[in-house]
């Protein structure tokens, strides 16, 4: 007798709707509760207007301590940025300035939170933003950015 177990994926976004890849620094995979540099795990989700799904989790053996101290010879941020390639938003309790700059250069937007919160709440907040008016950089990523057309403002009125 054999057994096959498969993960059943929830329904994805509607046709034509591009999901947003979101990374969340977590120690327990239930809460946003880690600093980016010291996170041993980072969960990645695809989020769209009406749903979300877990994609993967990245685990890291070497992390900086909570005070940001680490071996100067070892780059601990580079492997995290490589693993998160394709993510647009990266949520963490804290992100150091140099790490944030490297994220931005890699096309990611770091978002710092003051207090730990459930991952489900973070996903819900992203969905609310997607259903409202996302900032211009996200509209560009999602393919919904339309340059303003001011030509009508300059057309002459016919008398």
From Swiss-Prot:
The keyword DNA-binding belongs to this UniProt entry's keyword annotation: no
InterPro entries: Di-Nase_FeMo-co_biosynth, DiNase_FeMo-co_biosyn_sf, NifX, NifX-like, NifX/NifY_domain
Transmembrane segments: none
Listed Pfam families: Nitro_FeMo-Co
Recorded GO MF terms: metal cluster binding
Record keywords, A-Z: Nitrogen fixation
Function: May play a role in the processing of the iron-molybdenum cofactor.
Protein name, entry field: Protein NifX
Organism: Rhodobacter capsulatus
């Amino acid at each position: 007798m054999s057994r096959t177990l498969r993960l059943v994926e929830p329904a994805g976004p509607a046709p034509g709707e591009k999901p947003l890849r979101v990374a969340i620094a977590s120690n327990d995979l239930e809460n946003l509760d880690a600093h980016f540099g010291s996170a041993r795990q980072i969960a990645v989700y695809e989020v769209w207007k009406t749903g979300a799904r877990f994609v993967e989790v990245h685990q890291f053996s070497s992390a900086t301590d909570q005070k940001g101290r680490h071996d100067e010879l070892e780059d601990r941020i580079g492997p995290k940025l490589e693993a998160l390639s394709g993510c647009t938003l990266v949520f963490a309790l804290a992100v150091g300035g140099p790490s944030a700059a490297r994220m931005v250069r890699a096309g990611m937007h770091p978002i710092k939170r003051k207090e730990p919160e459930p991952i489900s709440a973070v996903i819900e907040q992203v969905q609310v933003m997607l259903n409202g008016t996302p900032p211009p950089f996200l509209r560009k990523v999602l393919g919904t950015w339309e340059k303003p057309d001011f030509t009508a403002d300059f057309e002459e009125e016919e008398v």
